[in-house]
């Protein structure tokens, strides 16, 4: 179910704002940008009539409900008034009041790409201690650190995740090279290769690494090897030239089968020419995405050539389409003189650089 805060809720929050650790100065650290507390939402977006709340059951055999959207560190008495001011929750009882946690972190720039500390052999860091926020972020670091800790214990070569083949690689690279200035969240915009980092091609991207590291049992290893072999065969079939007439249309041109797959009216016909299975579906998706990946490579090459493209001192970063508030803030604070300097701002994303490059190049044309 979904409900919303209202004017009564906001009045309750404002009346207790001075007792919130976040606003009274008891907590000085910056909270997660993408998970603001309800008092922060009301403070920053005072003109909003309400904020959405998802009422999430805690399980099938419990009456407990988690109100997702009103995380808070307000005193318990204020929280009770807040919850009971919300439509549908007038008689709700709070079992566990909300709270805020301020935690320390270790500078992740002191870690190797394996997440081992540069100065203390055998000591690995993963999760919030590295300044990240989020379950998936912590789990991914735990996987990377665990693999490498095991490798050290067994005197084996460690695992290094590449940013071109995994979001784990993007995150570890960002953390260990750039460090953080606020809690780090993994976003697709942080990857310059995000069009390639699809859910359906995870086996092809990371399967070879898993085989190399020996972390799969015999059955898993066989399934990965079979998948890679089947995809290779499918890719070869999609590279073969086929005329439109062979696919049931009047076009006599001969093109690779994969190119015909980009036509929506022929996609089912192309799929029917390949054996059914996830490896073959993945190969077809690769063929469909190929022009976009080629364009992406061209954009990255152009941005590399235009590193010296000047940014005027009075440049309005707010006028760049597609820039998030976070990216605008980072650019305004840093005040880069050119695109190269902008690319070296900690936390700046490839997506932001692409948007900035496009705007600057168009203005210079």
Labelled PLM ranges:
Residues 86, 91, 144-152, 342:
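Glycine-rich loop(s) and the adjacent beta-strand/alpha-helix scaffold that form part
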Residues 155-168, 357-365:
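Charge-dense, low-complexity polyampholytic segments
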Residues 138-161:
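Internal hydrophobic alpha-helix adjacent to the cofactor/substrate pocket in enzyme cavities
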Residues 190, 198, 202, 207-364:
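Extended, charge-enriched "interface" segments that sit outside catalytic cores
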Residues 66-130, 160-173, 278-330:
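A glycine-rich dinucleotide-binding beta-alpha-beta segment and adjacent secondary-structure elements
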Residues 128-136, 192-194:
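Glycine-rich phosphate/pyrophosphate-binding beta-alpha loops
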Residues 1-80, 88, 177-261:
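An anion/pyrophosphate-binding glycine-rich loop and adjacent beta-alpha core
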